[in-house]
Amino acid sequence: MKKRGPLLAAFCIPLLITLIICVNREIYPFGDQCMLHIDMYHQYCPFFTELMEKLKTGGSPFYSWNIGLGADFVSLYAYYLASPLNWLLILWPRGYVIEFMTVLSILKIALSGLTFTYYLGEHFHVWQDAGNAAAVTRTEKKTAVRLPADVASYAAALCGAAYALCAFMAAYAWNLMWTDCMVLAPLVILGLERLIRDNRPGLYYVSLAVCILSNYYISIMICIFLVLWFLLYWMEHRASGYRAWIRFAWYSLLAGATGAVLILPTAKVLSLSGASGISFPETMEWYFNIVSELARSLLAVDVYTGDSHWPNLYCGIFALFLLFLYVWNRAVPWKKKLPRLALVVFFWLSFSNNMLDFIWH
């Protein structure tokens, strides 16, 4: 089976569902409403308009006179506007910035489904084994779990759609600068696995560099996860030896150095802002009952935004069912399950503990 069908399904399913939501909510051109919400209305739309003018007229990329009495534009660009997709504004007609932002939001949701499906197909070797009678979900060679190739491929597509339509995307799709990292994260993780397993650094370096350039804030969280996933994945592929550590450190630093063109001037600006005075919490606190977090993975939960709220964990009720199946699956050895389950528990604690939350953010 070719990749095209499952990848197309992974792109089209969230795309169609998002369009149906737009029709239901009467979002233009299906009505007279728009997606402008909170900061998207007060900040992002004016910022996108300013970027469009600079791209079309060749204005200064370093400073803007249209923000108050004048303000630095580099740090604003680095956080809000650095997505490569935003450069499509140069082709977009003036006066239709809101429509551009709507299209961009929907496009990134669909692309998230595609990239996550591609990751699953590569991670579980679905595409490589599709020419055989069955695709193999490789745990260990002696205890491989076999699925028909078409089932494995389209199961990956459904998981990709669940990722694209998860509660986080439902809550923050209007935060356009964050969703690029949702698109790129699966590629970064796949690149890391190729780096460890096959000594192929290209995808890891390029995807991580673009991720950091697109939005350094979410990229911080991705980089923390990469350290954890590297340790876990390396323990499962020790044949790669300790040189994998050197490769991981080198190409991670190289990607960070690539992003430094925006990070360094932004760090200077942030050092002069009020946020620079925020310090590590002195006492440990728990935001809410950890057991109650399970409810955030259930059907029909409300999404939350803001600084103090329940985490948006829902990505389909079937995900919880699959977690229980994974725990009780005898084909997967406990020496492989325990580190992965420990990582899930660590995430669970991070959502509720103020110190871990501070580190992630």
State the predicted function of each range.
Residues 14-21, 322-326, 343-350:
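Hydrophobic core segments of alpha-helical transmembrane domains in multi-pass membrane transport
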Residues 22-24, 121-124, 191-197, 230-239, ...:
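Structural signal for the C-terminal ends of transmembrane alpha-helices
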Residues 125-152:
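Intrinsically disordered, low-complexity terminal tails and inter-domain linkers enriched
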Residues 24-123, 155-186, 214, 301-306:
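Active-site lumenal/periplasmic loops and adjacent helix-entry segments of GT-C-fold
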Residues 14-18, 106-122, 145-148, 152-235, ...:
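Membrane-embedded helix bundles of polyisoprenyl
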Residues 38, 42-53, 78, 84, ...:
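Periplasmic/ER-lumenal interhelical loops and adjacent helix-loop junctions
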